[in-house]
């Protein structure tokens, strides 16, 4: 008998078996939308959602996300990709074609604080995050009971700076074993090495507990309290080798005042962190994010 979540994911796949997503980035010039639309029409596709943005109509960069229905797209995917290559070459495009029914496989990394993990699992169970949670990896045991109760593989891996390279080697092997597409750092309190980051470019999503670029690094709530801030926030971003400086996907804030001590700021911040991370992960799973330089275009 299939589990509740297996049934839910199968129903989503069946309901979206003909849905494709096309992401495009190229130098801005006349005729891009016309050429892409004509291509989709010629191949029997019907556009159901389209968003575009240009950094500058004259000499800027153009970005496009199209969601479309195309009967039998799973069988046609390879031929569509081959045929679209000529359009892409004409406009010097960077592009990707994905299927909504091909759910991304997610690995969640977590430490002792579980509020972000709880939020991701809740959003997943309610159908707001359509993905396969392939594995949860932690340097603490606190999450094991929650994760294994849902029949999600859980791996405890002790981690600190002295054994980081050794641990990351094992983690990378696990990610390959579970065929992971995206990694979510749900308050995973370890700094990743350049080797780890380079193995998954723009596929590691972090939540930082401050409104970046304020209070980069550790203990942001304590420093925010000492500074007497009137706003606190959270930032979800792709991980790069520059600590907390990767392309920002989503941010949010809430007002605070002098009556809020460091612990109160932390409690308020947890609520913001949960929702910000969940939105960022959702948009990545739905192919709504394009990275440009050190920024993102988010078609949400």
Swiss-Prot record:
Pathway given in the UniProt record? Purine metabolism; IMP biosynthesis via de novo pathway; formate from 10-formyl-5,6,7,8-tetrahydrofolate: step 1/1
The segment(s) forming the ACT domain are: 21-102
Q: What is its EC number?
A: 3.5.1.10
Q: Which reaction does it catalyse?
A: (6R)-10-formyltetrahydrofolate + H2O = (6S)-5,6,7,8-tetrahydrofolate + formate + H(+)
Asked if the Swiss-Prot or TrEMBL record annotates the protein with the keyword Lipoprotein, the reply is: no
Keywords from the named record:
Hydrolase, One-carbon metabolism, Purine biosynthesis
> Catalytic center at which residues?
244
**Single annotated GO MF:** formyltetrahydrofolate deformylase activity
Q: Which residues form a coiled coil?
A: none
Report the enzyme's class at the first EC level.
hydrolase
Report any one BP term from Gene Ontology: one-carbon metabolic process
Question: What Gene3D superfamilies does the entry give?
Answer: 3.30.70.260, Formyl transferase, N-terminal domain
User: Known HAMAP family for this protein?
Assistant: PurU
**Which NCBIfam families does the UniProt entry name for this protein?**
PRK06027.1, PurU
The family classification in the record reads:
Belongs to the PurU family.
Q: What does this protein do?
A: Catalyzes the hydrolysis of 10-formyltetrahydrofolate (formyl-FH4) to formate and tetrahydrofolate (FH4).
Q: Per its record, how is this protein called by name?
A: Formyltetrahydrofolate deformylase
């Amino acid at each position: 008998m299939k589990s509740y979540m297996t049934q839910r994911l199968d129903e989503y796949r069946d309901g979206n078996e003909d849905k494709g997503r096309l992401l495009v980035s190229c130098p801005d010039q006349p005729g891009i939308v016309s050429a892409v639309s004509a291509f989709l029409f010629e191949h029997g596709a019907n556009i159901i959602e389209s968003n575009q943005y240009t950094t500058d109509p004259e000499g800027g960069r153009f970005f496009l996300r199209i969601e479309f229905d195309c009967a039998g797209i799973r069988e046609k995917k390879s031929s569509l990709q081959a045929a679209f290559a000529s359009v892409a070459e004409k406009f010097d495009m960077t592009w990707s074609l994905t299927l909504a029914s091909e759910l991304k496989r997610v690995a969640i990394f977590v430490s002792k604080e579980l509020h972000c993990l709880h939020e991701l699992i809740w959003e997943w169970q309610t159908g707001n995050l359509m993905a396969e949670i392939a594995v949860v990896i932690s340097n603490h045991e606190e999450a094991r009971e929650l994760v294994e109760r849902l029949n999600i593989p859980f791996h405890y891996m002790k981690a600190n700076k002295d054994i980081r390279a050794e641990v990351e080697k094992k983690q990378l092997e696990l990610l390959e074993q579970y065929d992971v597409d995206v990694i979510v750092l749900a308050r995973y309190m370890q700094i990743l090495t350049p080797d780890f980051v380079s193995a998954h470019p723009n596929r590691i999503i972090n939540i930082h507990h401050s409104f970046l670029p304020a209070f980069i690094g550790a203990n942001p709530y304590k420093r925010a309290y000492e500074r007497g801030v009137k706003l606190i926030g959270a930032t979800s971003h792709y991980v790069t080798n520059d600590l907390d400086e990767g392309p920002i996907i989503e941010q949010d804030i809430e007002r605070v005042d002098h009556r809020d001590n460091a612990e109160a700021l932390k409690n308020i911040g947890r609520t913001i962190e949960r929702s910000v991370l969940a939105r960022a992960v959702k948009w990545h799973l739905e192919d709504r994010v394009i990275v440009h330089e050190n920024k993102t275009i988010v078609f949400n």
